[in-house]
């Protein structure tokens, strides 16, 4: 048995406001999706959650994480490497996935001008490029895919 319909249950969970969350496991009222224009139609996979969150924040909606909920999810190969005593993650994504990540995130920034999105792009860029240069195989193809993704994102090529 669950709580009565329309009953406030926020007192049961501890929630924390965030700039972004992954959409896997996210509960979004249809009315909010309608207000923000729904999911991006031209993105294959990467950037969908960031686009949804950035558009929702721009319309005054909050993004909340309910603490204590766990969604086990693996990104890429989930490898870690140690370099000079520090451990780094490496996704080992294929070049096509890296292209999509960079293209979509730049397109999202261009459409929202969100500083939080820009900060996220900078963080992703450093992490992915560092991992590729230091630990991953197929370096040239991956870096070329990132460069094409950045270029196509700037040119708004979907």
Feature annotation, model-predicted:
Residues 85-99:
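A short acidic, glycine-rich active-site loop
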Residues 26, 32-37, 42-70:
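A short, conserved alpha-helix in the catalytic core of glycosyltransferases
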Residues 21-22, 45-46, 94, 98, ...:
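Aromatic-acidic/polar surface patches that form glycan- and anion
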Residues 110-158:
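Non-catalytic, C-terminal membrane-associated alpha-helical segments of glycosyltransferases
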């Amino acid at each position: 048995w669950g709580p009565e319909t329309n009953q406030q249950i926020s007192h049961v969970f501890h929630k924390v406001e965030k700039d972004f969350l992954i959409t896997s496991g996210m509960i979004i009222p249809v009315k909010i999706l309608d207000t923000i224009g729904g999911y991006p139609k031209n993105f294959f996979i990467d950037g969908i959650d960031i686009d949804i969150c950035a558009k929702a924040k721009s319309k005054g909606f909050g993004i909340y994480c309910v603490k204590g909920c766990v969604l086990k999810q693996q990104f890429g190969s989930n490898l870690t490497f140690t370099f000079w005593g520090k451990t780094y993650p490496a996704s080992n994504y294929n070049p096509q996935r890296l292209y999509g990540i960079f293209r979509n995130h730049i397109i999202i920034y261009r459409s929202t001008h969100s500083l939080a999105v820009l900060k996220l792009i900078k963080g992703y860029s450093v992490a992915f490029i560092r991992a590729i240069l230091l630990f991953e195989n197929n370096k040239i193809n991956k870096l070329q895919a990132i460069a094409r993704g950045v270029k196509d994102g700037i040119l708004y090529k979907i």
